[in-house]
């Protein structure tokens, strides 16, 4: 019954018989409904990894991994693309939970970051409320280079970088880059300046 109600309600919002057109207002109503129903949540964007330049509601994530998998599998996306999107969604949920349950991360929702200088993006950006340092999180289901994240670190926009990967044993590179298995995302710390 719930699924039929959801479909009927979304159809009313997204499609009007009179016009046959989908408008921006209709799409915004549908997104609002999905948010209020706790089906999706949003991430805000930090421009150039600056916690003072935040743009709200910039990216959406599913709040349930099963629903995320279902909808992604219906798109016909290749397995590697689905795997990458699901791993990023998983980390979003971990960060969201930590923001709601602890006082270690700035913001009301997780942030991702853009780097205008090179037109790149960082999967997640964390401003620590413990040591007041900037942390980058790059989520990789495969062994990719994380060029934007490394450039942000090199240019002093980030203090530390976590590379979360699906198939790794973990490790440290140069003292500021940490490779962590994806399954340990909930255990990464945002107080490294106090530890190192």
Region spans (language model):
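Surface-exposed, flexible loop/turn segments at secondary-structure boundaries
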Residues: 48, 68, 132, 144, ...
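Accessory nucleic acid-recognition modules appended to NTPase machines
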Residues: 1-122, 126-128
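Solvent-exposed adhesion/ligand-recognition segments of exported proteins
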Residues: 2, 177-178, 191-196
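Amphipathic, soluble alpha/beta structural segments
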Residues: 116-124, 187-196
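Catalytic cores of nucleic-acid endonucleases
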Residues: 140-187
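Active-site beta-strand-loop-beta-strand hairpin of nuclease catalytic cores
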Residues: 126-136
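Short, glycine/charged-rich beta-strand-loop motifs at protein surfaces that mediate ligand recognition
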Residues: 80-81, 136-140
